[in-house]
Amino acid sequence: MGSTRRRSVSLYHASGCHLCESARRVLASVQRETPFDLREIDIGGDRELEARYREWLPVVEIDGERAFVYYVDPDAFRRKAQSQSSA
């Protein structure tokens, strides 16, 4: 039986993005009850990241896989964050 590890969550955002602020609040709320590692990446000023993510913000990736764009549903995110991966 394998051990479990915490999910790694990345939030790609930009300054002044109201949807990004909403996503940040959802992640913070779920993180209080379900621990996961959160990395916030501001795409501003990085041409490669802007080209890749600008049209989709906010973008949430879980363990390197795109899970949400535009809107983060709290219940759906909670389910994904709670389903542990085998290490």
Indicate where each model-derived feature is located.
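Thiol-based oxidoreductase modules, predominantly thioredoxin-like and allied folds used
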Residues: 36-47
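A short, hydrophobic beta-strand/beta-hairpin element that forms part of a small beta-sheet core
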Residues: 58-66
